[in-house]
Amino acid sequence: LFPYTTLFRSIRLRVGRPLFYTYDGGEGFLTDHDGKYVVTREDLKETMEYISGYSLYSYEDEMRQGFLTVQGGHRVGVTGKVILDGNEIQGMKYISCINVRLAHEVVGCADQVMPYIRKKDWVAHTLIVSPPRGGKTTLLRDIIRQLSNGEEKKKMPGVTVGVVDERSELAGSYQGVPQNDLGMRTDVLDGCPKAEGMEMLIRSMSPAVVAVDELGRKEDFKAVESVIHSGCKVIATAHGNSIEDVIHQPYFEKLVR
């Protein structure tokens, strides 16, 4: 593993199967003297106890969503037996898989697109479109950082950015504090539904820009319209193979025309 430790992207543990990892440029399995190391249920139990600081109960709310975020902004997804109360998810037991996605920022990845988004005191409404795992969130994170910090050499002051981080992927917050660098003028609502969060930010935080990841629900688009009508700029992402693919979806068409 040594050559890849600084390049890890994810580590996946499945009960009864080899420990699997991905890194920049490839993937592999953990091996021992008998071959591929096979993960046991005890491995998963010990891993969950360790990453939760031996206080898994404190992550109950996050576990209902199938993941938790730990210090450093690393995201731990879990699968297993879902506990339901009617139609509501109450938690999870008999965990069978843990997927540790290691946080990584690409500072400067938005350099080439910033001239299209920011010109002196002007910020453009922006929609970033790509297929899953195409880098939307990474790009959005750096756009937020650059807008928030501003650029002194170009005499572009920073602006107040409000972020609704519904799934804790942009800021990677741990106990409410962003672990990723989103800039000095950025306020984050962590774990809040996008539609409700956008309304909250407009009412209470006076942002110049509101940023959200992965628009999709009808309620999201209504909230985006409210943000635009308030005079704020919106920067968001959406799943799609192309802009043409997205604008023909029901709620996007009205938004981007």
Residue ranges and their predicted role:
Residues Y54-A124:
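P-loop NTP-binding catalytic core
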Residues C109-E166:
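P-loop NTPase nucleotide-binding module
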Residues G35-M63:
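A charged amphipathic helix-loop-strand protein-protein interaction module that recurs
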Residues I11, V78, D165:
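Residue-level signature of catalytic and energy-coupling elements of molecular machines
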Residues M205-R257:
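Conserved P-loop NTPase nucleotide-binding/switch module
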Residues F2-L7:
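Short, small-residue-biased leader/transition segments that mark boundaries at the very start
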Residues S148-E199:
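P-loop NTPase switch/communication element
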Residues K119-D121, P131-P132, N149-M156, P178-D181, ...:
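Conserved catalytic network of the ASCE P-loop NTPase/AAA+ motor domain
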